Every structure is written in structure tokens, then in C-alpha cells.
Design a protein with these regions (language model features):
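Aromatic-Pro/Gly-enriched surface loop or interdomain linker
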Residues: 1-17, 216, 220-224
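Structural recognition of the beta-strand scaffold that forms the well-ordered cores
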Residues: 2-3, 18-22, 45-49, 137-139, ...
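Alpha-helical scaffolding within the catalytic cores
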Residues: 3-8, 34, 160-165
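Solvent-exposed loop/turn segments at secondary-structure junctions
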Residues: 6-8, 24-28, 46, 52-56, ...
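The substrate-binding groove and active-site-proximal loops of carbohydrate-active enzymes
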Residues: 18-27, 201-204
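A glycine-rich, often tryptophan-bearing local segment used as a flexible ligand/cofactor-contacting loop or short
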Residues: 26-116
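Catalytic beta-strand/loop cores that center a nucleophilic Ser/Cys/Thr
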Residues: 91-179
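Extracellular ligand-binding/catalytic regions of CAZymes and related secreted enzymes
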Residues: 151-165, 169-227
Length: 227
């Protein structure tokens, strides 16, 4: 097993059977993207969590802004910085309104990964993502909140389906993506701010740990409980 902060150890990735990512704004170079694709095509499995599909930048047009008492360079946004990487993942993060409560619906109760899982309510970042290519949705949500009205380009449509967990085949391999899972520890925002509020979101739910365990079983043994 190897732990890394980015995708730079391409030899280790290619030598692995399972890749797990829990990242935000970690940008693979073109060479690293080619390695990730080769890893999947040779049969690798990738369990991607939360912000893996989130690459961020700041719109500095109007200069620095104050965000919750902290000065940041500008308005954060998610430009399409790595289209091939996002196409490989199957989704690209675009935006999210504030953390809020929403329902998560099981779309395929007979799928081995979903066996015995019931619809549930969570409080998390309601991710709004472009869907790129063919994905097999296992969990989905529809957001209905006044906060959504602030979002552009039709994201405020209460009937719009937002994938929360899905599978995507790439060559001989496969990606399992779980959107839920924002968290923030007391010191996670350093050096931007000294301390911040602890936020656990879906990590506080037993069903979330069940989904994680099933994802690990899927990745390690190419099977899940009950399959």
C-alpha cells in the first residue's frame, strides 16, 4: 500500500490494483492522466470520493473578497482545466450551494453494491456536476432549496438528477465514484485561517461507512457483500 498527496508516482499507480482518491483541486499532469487511463485500461479499479472531480481557481476580476472573515484572491469557480481527466471520471464538478440537508435515493436496489441500502437523508455539500459520457447511477438526489435559486445555467431545476454514486467502465477497469463526503477538521484551513469549525457531513452517518466498506470490497476483491 502507498499513500501520496498527488498522482506523481506513476510507477506505483500502474503497479496497483486499486486506487482510492479523496482529493480536491489535485491536478494531474497530461502524463499522469495518461497513466491513470492506462491503469484503468489494464483492469485497475478506482474508488473516487467527493472532490476528486473538483478543480478550482479564483476569478480575480474584481479583486480579493471576504469569505466568512477570510480574505481570498477572488470568487472561486471551477473552470474546465482538464477535460480528458473529467471525461475519464465521468463527471466534472461545477458548483455547489451551501451545505444543506437533502435526500439520497437508491436507483438500483438489486445491484450488489446497493443490496439492503435504503433511501436516506444527509447534510452535505450538494454537488452540481456535468455528466460526461455513460455512467451507471446507483444513488441520486434532486435538490430543492431556496439556495439553489442563486445558481446559474439551470442548476436550480428541482427535477434535475444529481448523481451521488455511480460506476463507469474504462477499458478493462472501472471507476466507482461517491460524491458525498465533505469534511473539515479544526486545522484543515491553515494557512488561510488558524482554526475553523469541525464539519463531518455524511461522515456522521452509519450508511456512509457502509457505502465506504462496500466500495473497498468492490475494489480489493472485485466483489461486494451479497454478490
Amino acid at each position: 500500500m502507498s499513500v501520496a498527496a498527488d498522482f506523481s508516482d506513476t510507477e506505483q499507480i500502474l503497479a496497483s490494483d486499486l486506487l482510492i482518491t479523496y482529493t480536491c483541486d489535485v491536478r494531474p499532469t497530461p502524463e499522469q492522466q495518461a497513466t491513470l487511463k492506462a491503469f484503468l485500461e489494464q483492469g485497475g479499479r478506482w474508488f473516487a470520493l467527493h472532490g476528486t472531480n473538483s478543480l478550482l481557481d479564483f476569478d480575480t476580476t474584481n479583486g480579493p473578497i471576504d469569505a466568512f472573515g477570510v480574505t481570498i484572491p477572488g470568487v472561486p469557480y471551477a473552470p474546465d482545466l482538464a477535460p480528458d481527466y473529467m471525461a475519464m471520471l465521468g463527471t466534472r464538478f461545477v458548483t455547489h450551494p451551501p451545505i444543506q440537508e437533502f435526500e439520497v435515493t437508491v436507483t438500483q436496489p438489486d445491484h450488489p453494491l446497493m443490496a439492503g441500502i435504503e433511501d436516506f437523508t444527509t447534510e452535505d455539500e450538494p454537488y452540481c456536476c456535468d455528466v460526461l459520457g455513460d455512467i451507471n447511477i446507483l444513488l441520486e438526489s434532486r435538490y430543492s432549496s431556496e439556495n439553489m435559486s442563486e445558481l446559474p445555467d439551470g442548476w436550480d431545476n428541482p427535477n434535475r438528477v444529481h448523481p451521488q454514486m455511480y460506476l463507469k467502465k474504462v477499458g478493462g477497469g472501472e471507476i466507482l465514484y461517491l460524491m458525498l463526503g465533505h469534511s473539515c477538521g479544526q486545522f484543515d484551513m491553515q494557512p488561510i485561517m488558524e482554526q475553523c469549525d469541525v464539519v463531518k457531513c455524511s461522515w456522521g452517518l452509519p450508511v456512509y461507512y457502509e457505502l465506504l466498506e462496500r466500495g473497498l470490497s468492490w475494489g480489493i476483491a472485485a466483489q461486494v457483500p451479497g454478490s
